[in-house]
């Protein structure tokens, strides 16, 4: 685990809290007392979006219109500006961000907004070998109404690297987390799978973890070299709906997926 790898937790009315990686997998489900479940409904709605460091107009209106009804919002390239922190703490019980690198004013990295407090939180970082910029990932776990624990993995994969060694290396600690979790899993984010070797490495990883890919019928996901960059993988859940929202508020389009935590597909 790298030095300087930590998560910052934002909760309404409380000072921001720094959370270090847990010492062992044994703490999954034991790190914090299980509180209210993520959803009291028979469905779990998520929004997945590389928000482009909030550099474009309309990002906040997209979050307000589509994020407020979601139980989970998985952001990549999220800068902890006052506007984003205000939205997160006003609409969610917890917001956890892993600073990948610190910009002049506000740290940027993956950020998970959740309608329940996580019972486990593990920040991860990997440095890009060419630009020396870090990319981050965040593993959080939430109680479900049926007493199962849902593991959520928010990923922003390394972009600039020769070959796929560094790309695959970033997936290894994520795989360790998933392998030690017996319940349902959602793994989503910007995987930068713009080459065939990267896509093959990602699909191989998903197979090894018994993860399925969410399919989008009108697939308007951001592409590079003809390949989609953003993905949602899952296990132990059913997919009810999946759509891509076309917007100019970022250089990526948000993914909207509704799961039901009932009996998983065979």
UniProtKB/Swiss-Prot annotation:
One of its GO terms (molecular function) is catalytic activity. Keywords: Cytoplasm. Pfam families: Exo_endo_phos. One of its GO terms (cellular component) is cytoplasm. InterPro entries: Endo/exonu/phosph_ase_sf (IPR036691), Endo/exonuclease/phosphatase (IPR005135), UPF0294 (IPR022958). It is found in: Cytoplasm. Belongs to the UPF0294 family. This is UPF0294 protein YafD. It comes from Salmonella heidelberg (strain SL476). The lineage of its organism: Bacteria, Pseudomonadati, Pseudomonadota, Gammaproteobacteria, Enterobacterales. The gene is yafD.
